[in-house]
Amino acid sequence: MQTSECKVKGPIQEGCASGCEKSWSAYQACSGRVAKLEHDEKANCLGQFLEHVQCIDKCVGPKLFAQLK
């Protein structure tokens, strides 16, 4: 029986998130700044969010594929 990627990936992501606290803090700081800008519709934190996702993905990738082989 094959292991589902979704069942394996979730717990690995949660474990990897603790190693990406710096990028998460940067995203939260940006989010706080953007929330204060009431009239600036172009302001967003997409860059910081993508950096956080990339950090988690770099950690998850090797661990996930090792389990799915």
From Swiss-Prot:
What topology does the record note for this protein and the membrane? Answer: Peripheral membrane protein
Task: Look up the domain of life of the source.
Answer: Eukaryota
Q: Which BP terms does GO give this entry?
A: mitochondrial electron transport, ubiquinol to cytochrome c
Gene Ontology CC: mitochondrial inner membrane; respiratory chain complex III
Swiss-Prot/TrEMBL keywords: Disulfide bond, Electron transport, Membrane, Mitochondrion, Mitochondrion inner membrane, Respiratory chain, Transport
- Please tell me whether the keyword Transport is annotated for this protein: yes
InterPro entries per record: Cyt_b-c1_6, Ubol_cytC_Rdtase_hinge_dom, Ubol_cytC_Rdtase_hinge_dom_sf
Q: What does this protein do?
A: Component of the ubiquinol-cytochrome c oxidoreductase, a multisubunit transmembrane complex that is part of the mitochondrial electron transport chain which drives oxidative phosphorylation.
PANTHER family with a match to the protein in the record: CYTOCHROME B-C1 COMPLEX SUBUNIT 6, MITOCHONDRIAL (PTHR15336:SF0), UBIQUINOL-CYTOCHROME C REDUCTASE COMPLEX 7.8 KDA PROTEIN (PTHR15336)
As for family, the record states: Belongs to the UQCRH/QCR6 family.
Give the protein's recorded name: Probable cytochrome b-c1 complex subunit 6
Which organism does this sequence originate in? Dictyostelium discoideum (Social amoeba)
